[in-house]
């Protein structure tokens, strides 16, 4: 009913617009975007094309479509009626062409054949059925000109013909055909919501101008303009690539545990029951146990062990005056709580004392973790007797021992353990000291608790108590706390060089490190120190082209799994070193740190173009591909500025990079050409309009008076006898 009223309204011009073109060029999508305000999702864009026609009766059954058909163009109220058609060449479209006011002829910029059919098939057909109707040429699917065609083709159905880059038509191709046919040319994208209003507003203008020639008495058509020029579409600026840091290397606990089974670079021999020898590593034992830390810092050549306040050294966490005493006091309180929770059991020191060959008896512990200060005796050479210093140890001394893997003699520390310590439970304790974990299925939990008490490893006592109380799930938090504490202790040992067994000679100095930690965290280091190389048997390793700041960052990463920056750190040199050591996770962390710094500098209005040019080829050569992609993006999106400031450097780029710049530069070349053409055409249009306005006579005669016109009233007053008005 409302649709009939549109035809009856005297000042509403009803425009019939027929949309034609090949199949799958986007005719129906374009109509739906105008009539229904429909948008196209990525899924719909890539879906298999199904031939459809938008029904004209939507104007009768849908009030929203009818409301959207009404518009005002150049002060003229119009009602636009869109007619969709099939694109098959054999279809009979004479009914659709009947009484059409304007024809919109569509082709796809990704299908050259559809543009060829514009001249050979569609335009002749239009002129045959409606020779007086104006025609508008429209290039659809503009978004494919800047889309990632590889991703588009992957997402399409398997048998669909892929879109090739050389098939994408530049704007001048469509403009040439339009100029040859003498019709306006526009481009649209339903995905980008560009050009839809331009197409139909100018189609309305073309129809109204054609109608004005026949219905010259309609004064409201006097100010209708000819179809306007379309400003070129600037593709959206591509977002910078996101630096993705992969998950850190797994099996962080497996590698230290493997060092117990395969004691590479071992420097400690633990002797149990005079016959069992277990090889271990100072750095792992001392960073997991305060007792072992004090033990390995003892002076074995001079002086006498005084008491609990002079154990020969203090733990890395106990180095700050009064906080040292507070730490021991706090530690004892926690030890008492752990002992109470685990029932404070202990194993008799010998089977004979417990009553022959029966099982080991349990008795309440009397040490409670307090160091005894009765002094120690001395062994011949470098060594000490420790039985009065701790119940866990008998003696410690340095001696030449055969390496279990290389079979070469070298100096090691030999520690004889108390006879009550059994090999099986002690290995479980060592596994905890290396990994922070305790197997719930361990059978000798009592003996493990006994050893943990002797070594004052109260967290392990707590874990045993949790298992006995069926609360093993609580051990996960203890393990996490273990790793946090050991990470802090390892960092202090790295800073002070405590227990180091290798020194790296660098360009600007030396830095001490620990082979066991390096072997368990880096395959490259494991191959160097564990293989048939000179570095495996020497305490000094030369690292050329490496600075202390870079090596310190690498060591902290290998020791703690975290990246730590410093003011004197060179990002690119660190990436080079990390790539040499086959550490892709550290490379990614450094890439992220570098990109963050560059983006912060950009926000502070600092020019980073020169740095990006330097980083680009270095990053590509040293496998920092994410940083290289970011540099490529920055250069492409600032291409003109970079070329203006660094012309020689840009010309010296590799052919691959130059090809990438030409393909992905923003704004693209086709846009710059279109912008230049648009500005020239706009100036020509303004000049034509000025000349046209200048040629028009200033006084025109009308058939009736126009009392509202000031010029007519002036003319009437000057010539009262005249029956006409001049405007």
Swiss-Prot record:
Outcome, altering residue 449 to V: In DEE64; uncertain significance
Source taxon at top rank: Eukaryota
Recorded consequence of changing residue 452 to G: In DEE64; likely pathogenic; reduced RHOBTB2 proteasomal degradation; does not affect interaction with CUL3; no effect on interaction with MSI2
PROSITE patterns: BTB, RHO
Effect of residue 132 to Q: In DEE64; uncertain significance; no effect on interaction with CUL3; no effect on interaction with MSI2
Outcome of substituting residue 132 to L: In DEE64; uncertain significance
Occurrences of domain BTB (ranges): 266-442, 500-567
Pfam family, one: Ras
Gene3D superfamilies tied to this protein: P-loop containing nucleotide triphosphate hydrolases (3.40.50.300), Potassium Channel Kv1.1, Chain A (3.30.710.10)
GO terms (BP aspect): actin filament organization; cortical cytoskeleton organization; establishment or maintenance of cell polarity; regulation of actin cytoskeleton organization; regulation of cell shape; signal transduction; small GTPase-mediated signal transduction
Tissue specificity annotation: Ubiquitous, with highest levels in neural tissues. Expression is also detected in fetal lung, heart, and brain.
Residue sites binding GTP per the record: 21-28, 84-88, 140-143
Post-translational modification summary for this protein: Autoubiquitinated by RHOBTB2-CUL3-RBX1 ubiquitin ligase complex.
Effect of residue 219 to Y: No effect on interaction with CUL3. No effect on interaction with MSI2
Region (Disordered): 304-333, 703-727
GO molecular function, one term: protein kinase binding
Similarity comment: family membership: Belongs to the small GTPase superfamily. Rho family.
Role description: Regulator of cell proliferation and apoptosis. It likely functions as a substrate-adapter that recruits key substrates, e.g. MSI2, to CUL3-based ubiquitin ligase complexes for degradation. Required for MSI2 ubiquitination and degradation.
Quaternary organization: Interacts with HSP90AA1 and HSP90AB1. Forms a complex with CUL3 and RBX1. Interacts (via BTB 1 domain) with CUL3. Interacts with MSI2.
Disease in which the protein is involved: Developmental and epileptic encephalopathy 64: A form of epileptic encephalopathy, a heterogeneous group of severe early-onset epilepsies characterized by refractory seizures, neurodevelopmental impairment, and poor prognosis. Development is normal prior to seizure onset, after which cognitive and motor delays become apparent. DEE64 is an autosomal dominant form characterized by onset of seizures usually in the first year of life. Seizure types are variable and include focal dyscognitive and generalized tonic-clonic seizures, as well as febrile seizures in the mildest affected individuals. Biallelic variants in RHOBTB2 may be involved in autosomal recessive neurodevelopmental disorders. Affected individuals present with variable neurodevelopmental phenotypes, including intellectual disability and seizures.
Protein name per its UniProtKB record: Rho-related BTB domain-containing protein 2
Organism expressing this protein natively: Homo sapiens
């Amino acid at each position: 009913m409302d649709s009939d009223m549109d035809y009856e309204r005297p000042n509403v011009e009803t425009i019939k617009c027929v949309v034609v073109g090949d199949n799958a060029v986007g005719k129906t999508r374009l109509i739906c975007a105008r009539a229904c305000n429909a948008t196209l999702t990525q899924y719909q864009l890539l879906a298999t094309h199904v031939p459809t026609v938008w029904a004209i009766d939507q104007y009768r059954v849908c009030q929203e479509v009818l409301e959207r058909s009404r518009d005002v163009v150049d002060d003229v109220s119009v009602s636009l009626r869109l007619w969709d058609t099939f694109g098959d060449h054999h279809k009979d479209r004479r009914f659709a062409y009947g009484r059409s006011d304007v024809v919109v002829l569509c082709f796809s910029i990704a299908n050259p054949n559809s543009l060829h059919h514009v001249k050979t098939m569609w335009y002749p057909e239009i002129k045959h059925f409606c020779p007086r109707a104006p025609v508008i040429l429209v290039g659809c699917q503009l978004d494919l000109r800047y889309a990632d065609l590889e991703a588009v083709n992957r997402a399409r159905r398997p048998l669909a013909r892929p879109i090739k880059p050389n098939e994408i038509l530049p704007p001048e191709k469509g403009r040439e055909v339009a100029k040859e046919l003498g019709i306006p040319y526009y481009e649209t994208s339903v995905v980008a919501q560009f050009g839809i209003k331009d197409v139909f507003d100018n189609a309305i203008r073309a129809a109204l101008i054609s109608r004005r020639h026949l219905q010259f008495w309609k004064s409201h058509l006097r100010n209708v303009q000819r179809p306007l020029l379309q400003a070129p579409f600037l593709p959206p600026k591509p977002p910078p690539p996101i630096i993705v840091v992969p998950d850190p290397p797994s099996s962080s606990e497996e590698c230290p545990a493997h060092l117990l089974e395969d004691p590479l670079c071992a420097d400690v021999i633990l002797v149990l029951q005079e016959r069992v020898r277990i090889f271990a590593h100072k750095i792992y034992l001392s960073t997991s146990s305060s007792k072992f830390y004090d033990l390995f810092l003892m002076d074995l050549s001079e002086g006498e062990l005084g008491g609990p306040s002079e154990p020969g050294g203090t733990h890395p966490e106990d180095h700050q005056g009064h906080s040292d005493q507070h730490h021991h006091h706090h530690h004892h309180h926690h030890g008492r709580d752990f002992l109470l929770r685990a029932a404070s059991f202990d194993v008799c020191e010998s089977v004979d004392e417990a009553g022959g060959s029966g099982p080991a008896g349990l008795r309440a512990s009397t040490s409670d973790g307090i160091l005894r200060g009765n002094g120690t005796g001395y062994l011949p050479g470098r060594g000490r007797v420790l039985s009065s210093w701790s119940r866990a140890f008998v003696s410690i001394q340095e001696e030449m021992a055969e390496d279990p893997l290389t079979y070469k003699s070298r100096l090691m520390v030999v520690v004889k353990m108390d006879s009550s310590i059994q090999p099986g439970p002690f290995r479980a304790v060592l596994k905890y000291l290396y990994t922070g974990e305790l197997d719930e299925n361990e059978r000798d939990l009592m003996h493990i608790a006994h050893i943990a008490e002797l070594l004052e490893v109260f967290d392990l006592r707590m874990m045993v108590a949790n298992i006995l109380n069926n609360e093993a799930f609580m051990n996960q938090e203890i393990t996490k706390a273990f790793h946090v504490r050991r990470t802090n202790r390892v960092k202090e040992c790295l800073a002070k060089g405590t227990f180091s067994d290798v020194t790296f000679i660098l360009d600007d100095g030396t830095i001490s490190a620990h082979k066991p930690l390096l072997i368990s965290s880096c395959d490259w280091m494991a191959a160097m120190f564990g293989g048939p190389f000179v570095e495996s048997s020497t305490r000094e390793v030369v690292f050329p082209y490496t600075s202390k700041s870079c090596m310190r960052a690498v060591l902290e990463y290998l020791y703690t799994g975290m990246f730590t920056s410093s003011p004197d750190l060179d990002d690119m040199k660190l990436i080079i070193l990390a790539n040499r050591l086959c550490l892709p996770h550290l490379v990614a962390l450094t890439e992220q740190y570098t990109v963050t710094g560059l983006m912060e500098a950009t926000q502070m209005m600092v020019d980073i173009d020169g740095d990006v040019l330097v980083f680009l080829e270095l990053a590509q050569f040293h496998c920092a591909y994410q940083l290289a992609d970011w540099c490529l993006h920055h250069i492409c999106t600032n291409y003109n500025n970079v070329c203006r400031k660094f012309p020689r450097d840009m010309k010296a780029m590799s052919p691959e990079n130059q090809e990438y710049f030409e393909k992905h530069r923003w704004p693209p070349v086709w846009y710059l050409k279109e912008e230049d053409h648009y500005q020239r055409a706009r100036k020509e249009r303004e000049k034509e309009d000025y000349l046209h306005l200048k040629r028009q006579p200033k006084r025109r005669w009308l058939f009736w008076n126009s009392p509202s016109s000031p010029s007519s009233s002036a003319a009437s007053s000057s010539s009262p006898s005249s029956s006409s008005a001049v405007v």
